[in-house]
């Protein structure tokens, strides 16, 4: 599905990422972990075409995307739920979802995907005609995730989904991510500072420190790792 090799990227003369390499398989949830300033955001921007890598490759479904535009990458099926949600606050929930379904081939396809989204997030059916800006923070995050997945992407990037949310809302969103991966084969890149939450639903993970991959392993291996426990879990 996604294979990143030897990735270097940054801003102008300042390099942030140093030879990052990682993979995400079909229907797999992979956590990208690290503290603020570790390089997670730059990595996401490099994968989605917002930042152009200076060195390395980003191969998705066998195609090199490192020099492609963000729109091209989006059309290939890589969709990001950005940190901060970035909803159209004066538009209704349904209108926000329609904005995410720009690639739906037919109205019937959109309605089928909409029903799937409502099944995953029942509260959004109740709020369909409500302005997105009037929702709670947790409900707004649900709309942001739903808008990203209504087009049924191949790879969903969740960027800090737990930020500022109550634990029960985070659990609900991560449960939907697990369902998508298991039932629909959608791959998930989970970019998180909350390592406990991330590893609770991920299959594997990578820890980024100072723009480099410091550790990698299964969720169980990383949870048991002494460096992870001391540096990130406070154990």
Question: Where are these predicted regions, by residue range?
Answer:
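The feature captures the beta-strand-to-loop junction immediately N-terminal to the Walker
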Residues: 33-35
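ABC ATPase C-loop
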Residues: 148-149
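Helical segment within the ABC ATPase nucleotide-binding domain
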Residues: 171-185
């Amino acid at each position: 599905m996604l294979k990143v090799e030897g990735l270097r990227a940054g801003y102008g003369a300042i390099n942030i990422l140093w030879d990052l390499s990682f993979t995400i398989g079909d229907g797999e949830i992979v956590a990208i972990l690290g503290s603020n300033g570790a390089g997670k955001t730059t990595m996401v921007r490099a994968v989605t075409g917002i930042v152009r890598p200076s060195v390395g490759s980003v191969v998705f479904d066998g195609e090199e995307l490192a020099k492609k535009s963000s729109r091209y990458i989006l059309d290939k099926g890589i969709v990001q739920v950005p940190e901060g949600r970035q909803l159209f606050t004066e538009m209704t929930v349904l209108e926000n979802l329609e904005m995410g379904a720009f690639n739906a081939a037919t109205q019937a396809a959109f309605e089928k995907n909409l029903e799937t989204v409502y099944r995953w997030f029942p509260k959004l059916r109740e709020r369909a005609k409500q302005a997105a800006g009037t929702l709670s923070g947790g409900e707004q995050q649900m709309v942001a995730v739903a808008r990203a997945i209504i087009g049924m992407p191949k790879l969903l990037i969740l960027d800090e989904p737990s930020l500022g949310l109550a634990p029960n809302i985070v659990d609900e969103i991560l449960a939907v991510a697990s369902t998508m991966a298991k039932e629909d084969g959608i791959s998930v890149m989970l970019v998180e500072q909350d390592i406990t939450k991330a590893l609770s639903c991920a299959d594997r993970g990578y820890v980024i420190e100072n723009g480099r991959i410091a550790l990698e392993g299964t969720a169980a291996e990383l949870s048991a790792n002494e460096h992870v426990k001391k540096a990130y879990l406070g154990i």
